[in-house]
């Protein structure tokens, strides 16, 4: 179960997302992929020779923060048999992010959470979607880890910050959603949950698969 500094965490339906190409729908939990071949190989490479969990977590954070270049938006194009789909802010599978070496905050958090899930249980690792207050509020994604009876924020966009940032002492990060490859949660009252075929979050409106939500598929 994730941890929130303020607010009540509630379980929610998996969210239908369309953030790739050709309007393809995917579930929110599909973006954390601990069993992908590239993720498993990368996990083994990063953790080789590291004796403690703490060392391995630092290694994973350092890799994603430094080796995967950060850009606020990732424009991507897919062409299949002459048909082309363009997405100005694509959510990519962790394996693709690893291979291309570039990602937005969400893509980097998906990859880091997928790596961490090779070390920790679903109860201990979540991607967090929320707001970062840095002069003004902006949407952001990061990871949360429960380890040694403490909860930590792990900032996946940067390697030049401490790996372990205590959830209890950080006010700049405001969580709205938590998820991994198994389940999804929200902070009660921070998003409107609208019931259609699925009970969807209006906070995610820019990435939702509205065709599915409105029953057109």
Language model regions located:
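A structural boundary/capping signal
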Residues: 1-217
């Amino acid at each position: 179960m994730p941890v929130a500094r303020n607010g009540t965490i509630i379980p929610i339906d998996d969210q239908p997302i369309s953030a790739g190409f050709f309007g393809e729908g995917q579930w929110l939990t599909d973006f954390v992929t601990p069993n992908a071949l590239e993720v498993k190989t990368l996990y083994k490479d990063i953790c080789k020779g590291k004796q403690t969990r703490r060392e391995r977590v630092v290694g994973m954070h350092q890799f994603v923060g430094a080796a995967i270049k950060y850009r606020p938006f990732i424009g991507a194009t897919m062409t299949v048999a002459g048909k082309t789909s363009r997405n100005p802010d694509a959510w990519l599978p962790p394996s693709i992010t690893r291979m291309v070496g570039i990602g937005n905050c969400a893509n980097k958090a998906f990859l880091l959470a997928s790596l961490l899930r090779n070390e920790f249980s679903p109860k201990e690792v979540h991607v967090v979607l929320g707001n970062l207050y840095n002069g003004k509020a902006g949407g952001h994604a990061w990871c949360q880890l429960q380890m040694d009876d403490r909860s930590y924020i792990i900032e996946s966009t940067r390697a030049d910050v401490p790996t372990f940032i205590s959830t209890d002492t950080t006010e700049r990060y405001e969580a709205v959603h938590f998820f991994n490859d198994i389940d999804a949660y929200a902070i009660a009252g921070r998003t409107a949950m609208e019931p259609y075929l699925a009970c969807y979050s209006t906070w995610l409106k820019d990435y939702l698969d509205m065709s599915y939500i409105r029953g057109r598929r």
